[in-house]
Amino acid sequence: MTQLALVIDLNVCVGCHACVTSCKEWNTSGWAGPLVDQNPYEGSPTGTFFNRVQTFEIGTFPNTETVHFPKSCLHCEEPPCVPVCPTGASYKRPDNGVVLVDYDKCIGCKYCSWACPYGARELDAQQKVMKKCTLCIDRITDAKLSERDRKPSCVLACPANARLFGDVHDPDSEVSIAIRERGGYQLMPEWGTKPANHYLPRRKTRMHIDPEELTRVDNPWRKEDLTDYTGEETLDDVAW
């Protein structure tokens, strides 16, 4: 069975939030094809997020690092949010493995959010239904779009190419190769949910930089023919 998913490279992500804003834009405008939900955020564009980027500082000062961690629905192969839904609103598509919510059936009971160990579901305070990442199901299944554009908006928007999209069950796909060759891992596999989304780990980069290289090559103060300061008053000494 096809299992579409995201692979996110934590070594490349710079935390710019382009994926977050593009997700908001796509899921509120619908400029290129029918949406599964015509207005997923209702009147408040700040309310519900399908995708978030969490930023952490790790290590002990002064040897610290900043880690940006994008997080959304992982489209698990064994999604715990599906069997707990009393109305059948939460379901997993058999053709591509994407986990979705039928808003017409959802009663906002939050059972799915309690069952999800990743905190990927949020209650839309205005529509009173649970919402989450859909992998831009309207884009990836829209035959009117070119193959290049049939990807989630967050993937297309990422300036660092930190987000990959494809079939993790296809061993020859871009995502499968990245997982295999670059040590891709699942988030909390001990829960037995078999998350389809994977992360590529951060890699330690060691380099030696000469102090001289930290100074801009076009810095005029590096010129040897500068006139020595005579001690006379200059504009820099004037209190404005």
UniProtKB/Swiss-Prot annotation:
It is a peripheral membrane protein. GO terms for cellular component: plasma membrane. Transmembrane segments: none annotated. SUPFAM superfamilies: 4Fe-4S ferredoxins. The gene is soeB. Part of the SoeABC complex that catalyzes the oxidation of sulfite to sulfate. SoeB is probably the electron transfer subunit. Binds 3 [4Fe-4S] clusters. This is Sulfite dehydrogenase subunit B.
